[in-house]
Amino acid sequence: MNIELDKAIARFQEQNKNFAVKYMNENGEMPMLVAFLTQDDNKEFVTVAAPQLAALHTQEDKPRFIAAVKQAIQVVKPVALAFITEAWIIKRKKDEHIDTNIRPSLSPDRAEVVMVQIESYKNAALHLYDIIRHTSGEISLEYDEEYSNEKIDKSDVDGTFSNLLKENYDKFYREILDSINKNQN
């Protein structure tokens, strides 16, 4: 465990939550966005935003999106990743059955949310903001405390956009720790 790295990940998580809320409030919609936490040449932690991939709307676009993110991971070498989007989801507890033949956007039990999903070397976090659309055309966001979770065991996380860093955790984490330890000595 490294306190400097853990603090950087906590800041990254807060920055992405704040960005998502501000962006949605100002624009009324949220495209698919990905941000990475990595180190720059000076060994400072920085956030690198992936190019906006908002044009990817369809079910068929998802594999292309994931492939692009995985390619970016190889270049950026992040220790944390944020996936932010506006989405239709079906809220459920882990042990509840869900009909995977029905897309969330077509389910009668769907919820419209802004989702901020954070993945790091040691755990995942999920923050959901219910989108409330008023008859005036205005929107408001309400944080969903029941389904949001700051620290989720990565083995409990599933979904199309989950565990994208999985193949690189140990390698990138070890590189970052070595770099931090060299700078502290």
At which residue positions do the language-model features occur?
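N-terminal domain-onset segments
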Residues: 1-64
